[in-house]
Amino acid sequence: MATKVVLDFEKPLVELEAKLGEMRHCLRSSSREQAPNEAEALQNEIGTLEKKVEALRQSIYKNLTRWQKVQLARHPERPYTLDYIYMITCDFVELAGDRHFSDDKAIVGGFARIEDRVSGFSQPVMVIGHQKGRDTKSNLYRNFGMAQPEGYRKALRLMKLAEKFRKPIITLIDTPGAFPGIEAEERGQAEAIARNLYEMAKLTVPVICVIIGEGASGGAIGLGVGDRILMAENSWYSVISPESCSSILWRSWNYKEQAAEALQLTAPDLLSQGIIDRIVPEPMGGAHTAPEAMAGTLKGILIEELSALLPLSSEELVNSRIEKFSSMGVWNEEG
């Protein structure tokens, strides 16, 4: 059985939950031997402890620092792109290769269908996203979710295919950054990302981008130009990671918490700045605590956004998308 990953700030809660579990086990195993008043006293203690656990849970997860949200975004049990694809869509057909060099396993994508039997909504879509691994072997296979140039070119090929068949595009972003190796630079990493930005701005079909975990720098923006930009509640999106920012400004990774605060990289930060359009709520404790509930929430929001975008003409989509991104980063100077 795999060991549960516990983050530093979660340890007090986990310890209290373990104590609660022991008390419940004690009550179940010895209830027949205990006197009624002893069992009642233990039950009262359990009730008191349950309230303490819930109060501590609320206190921790409703007051997360920016760095703690970065940690949650990187949680190894968090749902990844393929998890969401299989929970949200049906009839997924994965497509491979960039038709130039190779098939980058850090990017996955293909046609699928989003359906809702209650509302009757049914829409074929192209889903594309970064894919990380769960262990050392799969992370090496997926290159830790860091795409090569051929990954971004594969993504663009699939986007153009979706445009040809008039199908909306959904991108799921979760990467620590584009792969920075020499071989990636030699094959045109910067050009591949820049080309995606240029082409995505002009796509004549609806494009919805969702940051589901990490959204680091050019590796994220290479899949991040769309009509709607959504962010999971405990994800982050920034030009640089807190550790890299800390190492540049303070010559040490020890100031990553301060860097995270300065970068303002969380979903509420970016919503207030007009960078994203909507926050996708997560279950208490993060998406990994209830993946299916998280997928259900995201599916409902995607259906809402698709329903709003599908009636728009190609010209309306392109014009509003270009205007949306052109207006970012505008500020006024006073004094």
Curated annotation (Swiss-Prot):
GO terms for molecular function: acetyl-CoA carboxylase activity; ATP binding; carboxyl- or carbamoyltransferase activity. It catalyses: N(6)-carboxybiotinyl-L-lysyl-[protein] + acetyl-CoA = N(6)-biotinyl-L-lysyl-[protein] + malonyl-CoA. It is found in: Cytoplasm. Residues 48-308 form the CoA carboxyltransferase C-terminal domain. SUPFAM superfamilies: ClpP/crotonase (SSF52096). Its main location: cytoplasm. Its EC number is 2.1.3.15. Component of the acetyl coenzyme A carboxylase (ACC) complex. First, biotin carboxylase catalyzes the carboxylation of biotin on its carrier protein (BCCP) and then the CO(2) group is transferred by the carboxyltransferase to acetyl-CoA to form malonyl-CoA. Belongs to the AccA family. Keywords: ATP-binding, Cytoplasm, Fatty acid biosynthesis, Fatty acid metabolism, Lipid biosynthesis, Lipid metabolism, Nucleotide-binding, Transferase. It comes from Chlorobium phaeovibrioides (strain DSM 265 / 1930) (Prosthecochloris vibrioformis (strain DSM 265)). This is Acetyl-coenzyme A carboxylase carboxyl transferase subunit alpha.
